[in-house]
Amino acid sequence: MLRALFEHKVRPDFLIGTSVGAVNAAWVAGHPDPDGMTELADIWLSLRRQDVFPLSPLTSARGLLGRSNHFISNASLRSVLEKNIPYERLEEASLPVHIVATDLKSGRAAILASGPAVPALLASCAIPGVFPPVTIGRREFVDGGVANHTPITVAIEMGAEKIYVLPVGYPWLNREPTNALGMALHALARIVEQKLDAEVEANRNVADIQVLPALDLADVSPADFSHTKELIDWGYRSARRQLESSNGRAQSAIPEKAKRPLRLDPSPVRAA
C-alpha cells in the first residue's frame, strides 16, 4: 500500500499509527521516499514469527499461573525496533510522527509525539495479555487498538484535510481462533474493525477520508510470517488498482452499517 501511494506522488505531511501501523509509520517518518518503502518491505520479509512472537514455555506458564501479566516477552520485538528505527527520539524523524497507545489506567487513547521512539512503539504494540504493558513516565500503556486503532479524529484536529487510511485487514475474523494468541488477536481485531467503521462514518463530512483496500487473504494467520511477500504484493496491487481507477484518489470503503462515533482523548503525552 505504501509503495503504491508513493508511486502516485502521495506525500504525507505527518503520520499517525497504531500497533503494527505505528511501526510502519515510524519507519516512513524516517525514510519518506520510494527507496524507504522498498527497505521496509525487505525488513518485513526478513522477519519470522519468533522475531516478534517468541513463545517461551516458562513465560507462558507464569502467565497461566497468574504470576505474570503477559505470555510473551517484548525483548525480541524491542531488538527488531532498535535495529531498524533510524532515530532514537520521535521528534528526530524527518516527518512528524504520532504514535497511538492506550493508557492502561484510564483506558483512553494517548498520542506519543516526542521522547524515545522504541518505548512508544512497544507501548502501541503491547497487545493486552500477550505482551507486557510499557511504562512511560509514571503511566502504563498497552496497544493503541484497545482505545482507538485508526485515530482519524486526531488527524483532523491536527489540521488534516485529506486522510489516507491503510487498514491491515482481518480476514481471520471469519475463523474461530485455535490458541490463546489467536484468541487475543481475534478480540483486538474485532474491536479495531468496528472502530474504523465508526470513525470514518462520523468524520466523512469533515475531511476527505480515503480508505485503501484491506488485506483479504482468509488462510493467513496474524502470527504467520511465512506469507509476508504474498501479503505485501496483494496490498500493493490492490492499492495501485484503486488509485489508478480513481485518478490518484483512494475511495472510501466502509460498510453501510457503521457504529456510533467514539470519544477520543487527543491529549499528547510526552515520553521522557
Positions of PLM-derived features:
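Alpha-helical membrane-targeting segments
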Residues: 51-72, 175-197, 261-265
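Short, hinge-like loop/turn segments at secondary-structure boundaries
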Residues: 31-35, 180-184, 229
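Conserved catalytic block of serine-dependent lipid acyl chemistry
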Residues: 21, 116-217, 233-236, 240
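Short beta-strand scaffold segments in enzyme catalytic cores
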Residues: 97-102, 132
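Patatin-like phospholipase
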Residues: 1-81, 113-123, 167
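A short alpha-helix-loop-beta-strand transition element characteristic
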Residues: 85-96
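C-terminal helical/tail subdomains of lipid-metabolizing enzymes
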Residues: 199-272
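C-terminal domain-closing interface element
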Residues: 64-85, 210-217, 222, 226
